[in-house]
Each structure stands twice: as C-alpha cells, then as structure tokens.
Amino acid sequence: MKLSDFDYHLPKELIAKYPAQPRDSCRLMVLNRKDKTIEHRIFRDVIDYLKPGDTLVLNNTKVIPARLIGKKEKTNANIEVFLLRPIEDNIWETLIKNVRRLKKNQKIIISDDFYVEFLSKDDEKAIVKIHSKDIKSDLEKYGHVPLPPYIEREDEEKDKDYYQTVFADKEGSVASPTAGLHFTKELLEKIKEKGVNIAYITLHVGLGTFKPVKTEDITKHKMHEEYFTIPKETLEMIKKTKENKKSLVAVGTTVVRALETYGKFGKTEGFTDIFIYPPYEFKIVDKLITNFHLPKSTLLMLVSAFADRDFILRAYNGAVKEKYRFFSYGDAMLIV
C-alpha cells in the first residue's frame, strides 16, 4: 500500500489545544465493522458497548516531564534538552537542537545544583549525564510537560494533570497513551461494577510515535522501538477472556502494539517494533478505543488494518464534517 492511501484533509482549527472537561465528556464516534454503521455518542457511553466478562486493557505508563530548558555554560545561550530514555544510572539518550555546537563535557545549567553534561552524539541523539541530588524531584520541579508539537502552545501547569491518565503508574513515557486520557476514576468504577475485567500493560511511549513516514511504499518504513511489559495477571486474564469467548478491548494503539507483539511472537517483555498496517490479521484484540490520528501516520495505518481503510477514511471525513476534535487532546473513537 502507498503512503498517499492514508491521507485526508484536516482543517487546522480541529486540532484540539485543550482536552474536554470532565475527561469523559468528549465525543465518541462508534464504528461497527460488521454493518459499517457509525454512531455519535459521548465518551462515558462507552460502557454500553462493554459486556460482563469482557476485558478492558489499559496502558499504565506515566509521562515524565521530559523537556528541560537550560543555559549553556560560558555562553549562557538558552538550550532545550528533551529526555528520551535512561540508558544506565544518570545517563540518558536525549534530543538537543544544534547538538553539533556542543563540546564534550560541556554543561547545560538547569538550576544551581541540577545540570546536564553533554557526553557524545549518537545518530541524531545526544547522550548526556544528568547531575542531580534527586532526579525525580528535579524533573518534577524544572521539567516541562512534553506536549506534541502540533498543539502549538507552551505547556501550562494544568497540563501536568491533563496529559496524564488517571491510572498512570509506571514512569517512562515522553508522550501520553492518549486513548486512556478519557477515562475518569468514576467511569472505571462503573465499568468494573458491570462485571468487566480491567487489566494493565505497560508500554513506554517514545517520540517515535510522532515520526513521519517518509517512504511512499509504506513497507519500507522503519518502525521505532518501544519498551513494553505484560504482567502475568494480564496474560491470565487474556487467556480466560478468550476461552470464555468474550471481547478483549484495547485502550489505545500502544496497548494494541503490546498485545499483538505477544500474539504474534509470544513475547511478554522487551522492545517491540511491530508495524501494523493492512492487511494484518489481529491475534488478540477484538475492540479498540483510540483517538483520531494524523494523516499518513503509522497509527492511522494501524486503525485502518483493524477496521478497513475505506471505512476509516469515511469515518474521518465524517468527523471533519461534524467538527470532531483531533489528536492527543481530541475526541475518541470506538471500533467494535
């Protein structure tokens, strides 16, 4: 398939800059794969599509305040360090603009006793050492929420809450698993009361999630890697759900990537670079809750594999017409 097969026109004003409040009051477009019908609901109505014995799988990763803004030692020039992932104690893989201008061991001062030391350049990434008495507390204090570039505004204090799911638990993401943002604690409680199982996986979302596809032949695209783990109790719940012929409902493309890596390769922990595009035979996932994705993105390819490309593009064009809100802070879609 070609990259141009996954394009659609999106007016810029439909890109959400802030999320709906309360979280579960955003719009929900429901796509039925069997009869190709589309319904327009509110997110909290998602409970109507879940049955006792079904299993809802959520990604409990937690977004770290990954953007650090500091000053170069000696020159005092402003510079941004974007943390990607820890390699070992205090050594991080990062993105730094104009990294070529940095000298080995040059310091980037964030505060009096919190600074970043540039070690080396690896591909487009910069390897740094973080000097801090308490990294976690310094990141909370000085780090900025890593909002996606298309939101086109500076992060605000309230984004620390908005851009984190209510069940975030395991630190490590530099982008939010956004389908999970729509759930409130109350809605999850009601879902449990209905007899639906709730299970968790962890997949740390990397910046690669925003990486554009540059090859017209999509099969030539090199997919980014992300670290994931599926706990034993979740595996047992998946098995039980399948045995009872109930539905496995994935909340977000990150959950799909983790579960399908397990379904296809039997892997329950480690890095996954699974690239799902049509035609793909899903092994685990029966229903999918997701947001509206960027044109020509790997995430749009994944949902097109799940539902059918023509149906998805018809739904997206309908969403534009109905003025749905798009991307990370936007509205949601349920595919049954």
From Swiss-Prot:
Cell location: Cytoplasm
Entry-linked Pfam families: Queuosine_synth
EC number: 2.4.99.17
Keyword Transferase set for record: yes
GO CC, alphabetical: cytoplasm
GO molecular function, one term: S-adenosylmethionine:tRNA ribosyltransferase-isomerase activity
GO BP terms, alphabetized: queuosine biosynthetic process; tRNA wobble guanine modification
Chief location of this protein within or outside the cell: cytoplasm
Catalyses which reaction(s): 7-aminomethyl-7-carbaguanosine(34) in tRNA + S-adenosyl-L-methionine = epoxyqueuosine(34) in tRNA + adenine + L-methionine + 2 H(+)
InterPro entries in UniProt: QueA (IPR003699), QueA_dom1 (IPR042118), QueA_dom2 (IPR042119), QueA_sf (IPR036100)
SUPFAM superfamilies, A to Z: QueA-like
Keywords of this entry: Cytoplasm, Queuosine biosynthesis, S-adenosyl-L-methionine, Transferase
Pathway: tRNA modification; tRNA-queuosine biosynthesis
Function: Transfers and isomerizes the ribose moiety from AdoMet to the 7-aminomethyl group of 7-deazaguanine (preQ1-tRNA) to give epoxyqueuosine (oQ-tRNA).
Family: Belongs to the QueA family.
Oligomeric and partner information: Monomer.
Family annotation (NCBIfam families): PRK00147.1, queA
Protein name from the UniProt record: S-adenosylmethionine:tRNA ribosyltransferase-isomerase
Organism this protein belongs to: Sulfurihydrogenibium sp. (strain YO3AOP1)
Gene of this entry: queA
